[in-house]
Amino acid sequence: MRNSAAHPVPAAPALTEVRLGDQMLRVPSAAGEPVRPVDRLLAGAVTLAPDARVLVLGGGAGALAVMLARRVSQGKLLLMDAEATDLDLAEQTLRANGIGNATVSRDITLAAGQAVSFDAAVMALPKGRKLARRWLLEAAAALRPDGMLFLAGPNNEGIQPVIGDAGALFGPVTPLGYRERCRIARARKGDMPIPPPWAAEPGVAPGTWRRFSAGVRGVTLELESLPGVFAYDRLDDGTRLLLEHLEIPPGARVLDIGCGYGLIGLWAARSGAAQVDLTDSSLLAAAAARRNLDAHGVHQAQVFTGDALAPVAGRSYDLIVTNPPFHEGRAVTSAAAHRFIQQARAALLPGGRFVLVANRFLPYDQVLRPLFGTVTRLADDRRYHVISSEC
């Protein structure tokens, strides 16, 4: 597999002024939620020495990182996140506010040299308890003795169980407050208890992967993935139905949008595609996809991080395939799929096809018909349908 292209330097964004605590900040206007409730909660509770070294896990659009970096004017801040699109926004926010003591990392785990080097870890709850546990383990490894963990998140997204996990890992946890339906707590890295059993779980323990097998059309593929990736430990039923009915033209140029751990792109490469591009906004998904392509000896594929087709702008394809997300947080939404469809139509070569799988209750046929000449239902079952559209 070829390495993906270097991360592009973004154009100067349009900016909006927002308030966080007692400070005014500039953030990209494109940020859907420039200041989250957890940002306000953490900004009011995190105490730092001016020379502190701070690790931020899950910084959103970067407003919190700006405020914390200002507080540690003689120190350093490292920002990590699972989403490349959030890190893009955070980089723009840091630049827009003239922050020079903060670094954005696109690695999925801390480097060995960063262990036991931070005075504080500030963590906003990610999606999924197992990814949260992985981040707690990262924070525990990163903190020096007596370093502090600050953890916050929404009640309805599972912050209370994760605060319990922090207690199992660090020892006693101190609640710091509740506001805007979010909780915040603090833990100190002192004499650590015996690690809980989940601390050694594959994929949860930093540096490890969750291994599993996926059977498609009589072929068994060994795969690896990580918590935070959709259906990270199995072949989901929608993708299975899609692959059972997906035909790859020999020599085709194929794009897999929202690739997850890369199975669709891997299948296309094994089935005769000349070139396969895969995109996902998740750094965890992209890392898993690269790992699976490499493990299966695929050399005609390239994995990109970014939103939808933005990382492959200007490229054209014979076949574009996707199993699009239909949740944003706890809400059901087709916004991502609509964006995928619009962008895919513009990237298809004459005679090209766009194939997607979706829940049957999502009427994507109505979105596809005005854009494509032919829309055909290839397959369906009780939960999913596979739709093919041709130029």
Segments (PLM) and residue ranges:
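SAM-dependent Rossmann-like transferase core, predominantly class I methyltransferases
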Residues: P10, T16-A49, E180-G251
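A short glycine-rich, Lys/Arg-flanked "PGG" loop and its adjoining helix->strand segment in the class I
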Residues: R133-P145, H338-P350
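Class I S-adenosyl-L-methionine
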Residues: G171-R210, N359-C391
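Conserved beta-strand signature within the Rossmann-like core of class I S-adenosyl-L-methionine
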Residues: D146-P154, G351-A358
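Conserved proline-anchored active-site loop of SAM-dependent methyltransferases
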Residues: D119-K130, I257-I264, Y317-R330
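Conserved SAM-binding loop
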Residues: L79, L151, L278, L356, ...
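Conserved SAM/SAH cofactor-binding pocket of Class I
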Residues: P34-A112, D237-T322
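Class I S-adenosylmethionine-dependent transferase superfamily signal
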Residues: L68, A139-A140, A166, A268, ...
